Amino acid sequence: MKKILLLLFCMMAMTVQAQEWPASSIQTYAGTRWWWMGSAVEEKELSELMKEYSSHGIRTLEITPIYGVKGNEVNNISFLSPRWMEILKYVEELGVRNQMQIDMNCGTGWPFGGPEVPLEEATCRVMYRVDTVQVLKQMSLDLTPDNRLKVASTTEEDGENVLQTALLQRVMAYRLDTPADTQDLTSLVQDNLLTWEPKIKEGSTWQIFSVYQARTKQRVNRAAPGGEGWVIDHFDAKAVKHYLDRFDKAFAENCTPYPDTFFNDSYEVYGADWTPGIFAEFAKRRGYKLEEHLPELFLNEGEDPTQVLIDYRETLSDLLLENFTKQWTEWAHSHNVKTRNQAHGSPANLIDHYAAVDIPEVEGFGLSDFGIKGLRTDADKVRPNYSDLSMLKYASSAAHITGKPLTSCESFTWLTEHFRTSLSQLKPDLDLIFCAGVNRVYFHGTAYSPTNDPWPGWKFYATIDMSPTNSIWRDAAKFTDYVNNCQRFLQWGEPDNDFLVYLPVRDMWARRTSDLLMMFEISNMYKNAPEFIRDVLLIDSLGYDCDYISDSYLLGTTYQEGKLKTAAGISYKALIIPGEVRMTSQLKAHLDRLKAQGAPILYRIDNAEMNRLAKPEELKTVCGLHMIRRSNPTGYHYFISNLTPNDVDQYVALGVDFLDAMLFNPLNDRVHYTVEKRDGKVRIRLRSGESIILQTFNMSVPNAGKQPVLDYAVTKDLTTGAWTLSFEESAPAVKPTFKLPKVQTWETLGDDSVKVTMGTGVYSCRFTLTTREMANHWAIDLGDVRESARVFVNGKYIGTAWSVPFVLKLSNLKVGNNDLRIEVTNLPANRISEMDRRGVPWRKFENINVVDIHYEHTTYEHWEPVPSGLNSTVKLVRLQ
């Protein structure tokens, strides 16, 4: 009897616990890239700013030093100097005090490099020349580097500057007539002069390839003081170790604790298609000599130029993985530090490189256009989002197949022009990031700015500016609450995607491009992998989800208990090979063994066969919603977002079995509801732009009440009437109080100051409710809000509307008169454009200073006024 009671007690406890929100932690809160301009930071300012960041829901700071502020050179602090290390130690102490995690870029700007990198360890490129000669007797050929040298990949730095670094590596002769012959003439070169007498006495025609290694002379981009210098050769183990030695020395000599995580930004090492040891490394890894196949590599000629190209690109991938990514991570681990890495851009198998670190990180770059109803648009002042679902899934796939708990994302890079990004514009792309498997968001980003610096303060050019100097900061805490609430669920449990999809990287490498180097940059994936992108998006549209897998991790995958299991123990229902793809004989043999054991392996996207193996999610196929599913000890949980122009109210079948289900509203962690069920289906109601968390249970759970529904058949229009508009926070200050016959945006009013102000306008009105009307529950629909709004009823704070639809559930209503107060905060666009019209010199930064979304230097005086305030209607809507 006691055992039965104990079992019942445990089941009841599990049921109660299952209905609760997962706990928050530092990692469930948002992080941000913290730009230190010139590293000109100061203790008192740091203390105040870190309190402010923490109170607004930013709990991880990734320090990235960059170029400084003009005229402030005296306050710059050299990277890794004793003073810099002292400041880092202080920041780490403040982090503990403010419950914050401190990360650190393993360099300044990007990529890795700096003053201690000698030219012989800097980025390397190949240059070559081809001479066709007819040899009758002894011949001489002057091979001194000159303008006849060709490059195989483009860089930012070409011409004489690079030619001066060219060193002859190999001279190979290929006989063009019969019999074919290849000879290595390198040893016959003295002081760049080739002297050769072929053993074949009769005249013969030869193609002579002279291969040079040169340095690209790329310098660290956006470097901070103390970080200027050459970019390292990432393929060279010695160069990487030498670079990391500088950090060992700085931390040891200054007794500074290491940060929680070291970070590496996206691979932006341009034209670095070579390394001094490549010939030996190629022969060791590929089993033949690259120098014997130079016509295939450089001219696309010969017996099998495609295979040589693939092998060359795979060798670079191997060297980058072993000599840079793994060495860097092993070094960090020796100091009990984690690594977070953006592999995109690498000339490499992205899955292997993302998987080699502790936290794979992808990047959201640009603004998606989902057509969401009511979402503000800024047609000519946004960048299109190159980071579609297929791109975002590289990092999460690597984390999933290796059992790593976190996938991070550099979020909101270059969404819009400066000063024009609203909180409402962030949510759709954030939801897309979450649906791709990301569960650790870092904002891009936050610039340290002294509190006494005149507005707009210190700015970094490509960021949304999530900082106290931006007007969106006033309501940003509600946005970061949303991030935290979503990540509490998304970091809980394990991934539960249906299929593994083989990444056909050799087919990508086989594509002959204008550059020998193939960099998998976000903006070029549509060129490098169009077929793979098409297949991934097709799988998604059929109602399934997948993770990508590479050769190395597929070779470690087994078939157990009817499931494919990666070496980390993550299970999948089947493997999809996307068509006729190139793969090694070793991998083919492994797949044959798996298939013989009964493992389902699909050699094309076969919807009927996929349907037999997994249940498609009608959330996708019927409703067109975005979603991701994870498993947990009592069932499953979904993050679901309506990134469509349509409102959804639909009963749908789920892809998993369940007994009960609940809904959690990530906009408010105090709210959850019992799901309506019918015939084994669940009811999903989401307006355009909304998101929800659905949790299923393998047991019954107590009823938590129904999800309230807006009934637009019963409304009370407050748009017209006796409104007042005043300003409590504004710059420039707006002193008048305006009486309005109906709600309208304030830049349309006649007052000069209100047209250009940045701040918070307070709309106030009084409305009445009858006893009959009070019998209803009400919500308020604020229509088109520019840009966020806090709502108060009869003096009580109701909530903040910062995302579409701008609707809040009301409380504290009463029969008779009710006082409504709506505090609307706008963007800084009107203020900054007015400053440019007056010629205020706020662009004061070194290096690139401030550029627009097209990387051009421009000013904003031509901007038309941006709507600010309530831009349409205000209605009470009955809740059912």
Residue ranges and their predicted role:
Residues E160-T165, Q169-A252, R678-D711, N817:
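Extended acidic/polar, glycine-enriched regions
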Residues A30-G31, E42, S47, T60, ...:
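Carbohydrate-binding surfaces of carbohydrate-active enzymes
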Residues F112-L119, V130-L141, P145-D181, N607-N611, ...:
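An acidic-aromatic loop/edge-strand motif
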Residues Q19-T60:
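Mature N-terminal segment immediately following signal peptide/propeptide cleavage
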Residues M1-E20:
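Bacterial Sec-dependent N-terminal signal peptides
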Residues I66-S187, I200, I208-Y212, V220-N221, ...:
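Acidic/aromatic-lined carbohydrate-recognition and catalytic surfaces
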Residues A173, L564, K620-T621, A789-G795:
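Short aromatic-centered micro-motifs
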Residues A653, F767-N794, A801, L820-V824:
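Aromatic-lined ligand-binding clefts that engage carbohydrates, nucleic acids, or primary amines
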